[in-house]
Amino acid sequence: MSEDYRYITYEVLDEGRIARIMLNRPGARNAQNRGLLVELNGAFLRAEADDEVRVVILGGNGPMFSSGHDLGSAESRAEYTPGPDQHPSYQINGATREGAESLMLQEWHYFFSNTRRWRDLRKITVAQVHGDVYAAALMLMWACDLIVAAEGTRFADVVGTRLGMCGVEYFAHPWEFGPRKTKELMLTGDALTVDEAYQLGMVSKVFPEAELAEKTLEFAKRIAQTPTMAAMLAKEAVNQTMDNMGFYNALNACFTLHQLNHSHWAQVHDNRFPVGLEEDGLPNWRTAPPIVPAVKDKVRAEE
């Protein structure tokens, strides 16, 4: 196992044919601070450059796959605050620009463009998810070609109901959930169960959590037996079909809407906060009611 990373782990398995990347901030529920995202991009590119690697697994250590963006841990604050602990990425890629331009360029580079790059990685990628997959965690998962989930996994994007945002930066929701289910989940903040995700075709396999890592590896080994050219062209055929149906252009358009949403809140708050707050009628995201599954015969499921 590689010791080159602080926020992730990287190892090669199956005689080098499989690379496994694990988000490794379990104490922060694998919240995505800037250091984690930069390391994750480097790990994906490392696997892509390795001609022995055929399949890349992406998972998370701890009780859940990921809780999404890091919204303000001490570590995350230190990363963007000028000083000795500031992450270098907060001095480039638009970080020194003013107004909406700075946030737009930073989010484009580290949230949006990164995710699109991983979606088109020249390897087959498998997301190994468990526990909860919230908000920006959906982006990491959806960038993968296939998804293997543990029993009981839940999927939710609560940025609408808790931050007043129209969705995360890589807005693949209508393509993954379906149009009306996306509207329901975004407008209520409810979660999709793993069984529903399987029925939608979003999730390929569901296993007991205790067996998840083992079964995902077995699945990856099976996929790795496919000739690399055939695997790559099969992936490319599907991705190009989606892009020709409008996926790529829709992502770009929705990223722009996301930035408009940020600019709205920044203007409302005199350029202090680019998201909705309690004073805007939203719950405090730290103390908001628990996320519950969307149930067909209940307005809100029991907690």
Label every model-predicted segment.
Residues 113-122, 128, 134-186, 215, ...:
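CoA-thioester-processing core
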Residues 148-149, 203-212:
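Short acidic-hydrophobic, aromatic-tinged amphipathic segments that line or gate anion-handling sites
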Residues 68, 108, 112, 135, ...:
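Glycine-rich phosphate-binding loop at the start of an alpha helix
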Residues 1-16, 65, 73, 77, ...:
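C-terminal alpha-helix plus adjacent terminal tail
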Residues 21, 58, 70, 140-142, ...:
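Hydrophobic/aromatic residues within transmembrane alpha-helices
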Residues 60-113, 161:
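Glycine- (often His-adjacent) and acidic-residue-rich active-site loop
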Residues 1-63, 75, 301:
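Conserved CoA-thioester-binding segment of acyl-CoA-metabolizing enzymes
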Residues 35-39, 110, 117, 215, ...:
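Charged catalytic carboxylate motif
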